[in-house]
């Protein structure tokens, strides 16, 4: 079907199948649509709310057009959020990825520049001295040798440049805000995915099933796209094609409730200071606890099922300063 027919289908309020969505997003990523067509399409999908098939199709097109990453055959994970929760916190997922790697897990973190906060994953890593523009081969080498690598979205999904001016002009959430975590070019075995709105938990979970994720968690923590300690975290666990929904409280991690305010971050330089202190075992207790809770859930994907024990192990590990050594090694690639 031609793009125009697919667009017409959207304009008339009809949804697209996965294959139709893949075809349309292929056209977008390959620069075959005008800015006006892209804008109209994004708004049509926003007004009706994109369904699982449409999101899965957009993910498929993104991965088909992505720069290739030499995928390892050992199990590895991604921990990544949509961003856009408007909370301006420290970089929790980035810290958790480094901590988990220094404890023996393998993490290929997909990330980008800031969406709505002052400091996205690549912003803070750059401030920490990490080269976010390494080649896929160098990134793979880091994953092999130190257990963690960072895949900069703009480097792998260059076709998204066709959408950038439209997204900037629209100034509103679109389907592209929810694609990021789902389009890691390394195609991880496991995923811990944070979403900025509670209603996205179900959408994401169903999309993860459609994408045949082996084992994933989708989380929304009382306004955060992370596991929260200031309130409840809504969770969807996707395993072998089935979804289980539940909530987690700070008590489930053996931790006390703490304020969201205690996680406020700042510019990349400020967040880099917070992360350095944390990884050296000298950070704020609230930062350590939040990263421990998120890392604990990430480790569960690797078969470490006891969240409270995981938290204790992470907190002890942070005090050892070994996580900072992993960060220092990451800066050498």
Swiss-Prot record:
User: What keywords appear on the UniProt entry?
Assistant: Amino-acid biosynthesis, Aromatic amino acid biosynthesis, Glycosyltransferase, Magnesium, Metal-binding, Transferase, Tryptophan biosynthesis
Q: Which organism is it from?
A: Haemophilus influenzae (strain PittGG)
Which family would the database say this protein is a member of?
Answer: Belongs to the anthranilate phosphoribosyltransferase family.
Query: Which cofactors are named for this entry?
Result: Mg(2+)
What's any one GO cellular component for it?
A: cytosol
- Protein name per UniProt: Anthranilate phosphoribosyltransferase
Q: Upper lineage ranks?
A: Bacteria, Pseudomonadati, Pseudomonadota, Gammaproteobacteria, Pasteurellales
- Reactions the enzyme catalyzes: N-(5-phospho-beta-D-ribosyl)anthranilate + diphosphate = 5-phospho-alpha-D-ribose 1-diphosphate + anthranilate
Q: Name one GO molecular function term.
A: magnesium ion binding
Enzyme Commission designation: 2.4.2.18
Purpose: Catalyzes the transfer of the phosphoribosyl group of 5-phosphorylribose-1-pyrophosphate (PRPP) to anthranilate to yield N-(5'-phosphoribosyl)-anthranilate (PRA).
Q: In which pathway does it act?
A: Amino-acid biosynthesis; L-tryptophan biosynthesis; L-tryptophan from chorismate: step 2/5
Q: Which residues bind anthranilate 2?
A: 167
Q: Which residues are involved in binding 5-phospho-alpha-D-ribose 1-diphosphate?
A: 81, 84-85, 89, 91-94, 109-117, 121
Q: What class of enzyme is it?
A: transferase
What does the entry list as the binding residues for anthranilate 1? 81, 112
- What's a BP term from Gene Ontology annotated to this protein? L-tryptophan biosynthetic process
Q: Which gene encodes it?
A: trpD
Quote the cofactor binding remark: Binds 2 magnesium ions per monomer.
């Amino acid at each position: 079907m031609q793009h125009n027919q697919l667009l017409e289908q959207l304009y008339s309020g009809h949804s697209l199948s996965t294959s139709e969505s893949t075809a349309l997003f292929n056209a977008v990523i390959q620069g075959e649509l005008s800015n006006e067509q892209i804008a109209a399409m994004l708004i049509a999908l926003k007004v009706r709310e994109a369904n699982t098939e449409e999101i899965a199709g957009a993910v498929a097109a993104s991965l088909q057009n992505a720069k290739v990453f030499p995928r390892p055959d050992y199990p590895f994970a991604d921990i990544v959020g949509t961003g856009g929760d408007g909370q301006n916190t420290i970089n929790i997922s980035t810290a958790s990825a480094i901590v988990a790697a220094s404890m023996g897990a393998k993490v290929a973190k997909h990330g980008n520049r800031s969406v709505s906060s002052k400091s996205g994953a690549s912003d803070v890593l750059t401030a920490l001295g990490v080269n976010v523009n390494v080649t896929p081969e160098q990134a793979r080498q880091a994953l092999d040798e130190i257990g963690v690598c960072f895949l900069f979205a703009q480097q792998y999904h260059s076709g998204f440049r066709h959408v950038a001016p439209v997204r900037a002009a629209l100034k509103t959430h679109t389907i592209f805000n929810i694609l990021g975590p789902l389009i890691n070019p390394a195609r991880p075995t496991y995923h811990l995915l944070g979403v900025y709105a509670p209603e996205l938990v179900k959408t994401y979970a169903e999309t993860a099933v459609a994408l045949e994720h082996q084992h994933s968690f989708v989380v929304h923590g009382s306004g955060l796209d992370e596991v929260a300690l200031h309130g409840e975290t809504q969770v969807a666990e996707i395993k072998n094609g089935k979804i289980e929904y539940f909530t987690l409280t700070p008590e489930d991690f053996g931790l006390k409730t703490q304020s969201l305010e205690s996680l406020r971050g700042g510019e990349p330089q400020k967040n880099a200071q917070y992360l350095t202190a944390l990884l050296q075992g000298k950070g704020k207790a609230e930062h350590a606890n939040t990263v421990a809770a998120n890392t604990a859930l990430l480790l569960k994907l690797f078969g470490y099922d006891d969240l409270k024990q995981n938290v204790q192990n992470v907190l002890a590990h942070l005090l050892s300063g070994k996580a900072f050594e992993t960060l220092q090694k990451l800066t050498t690639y």
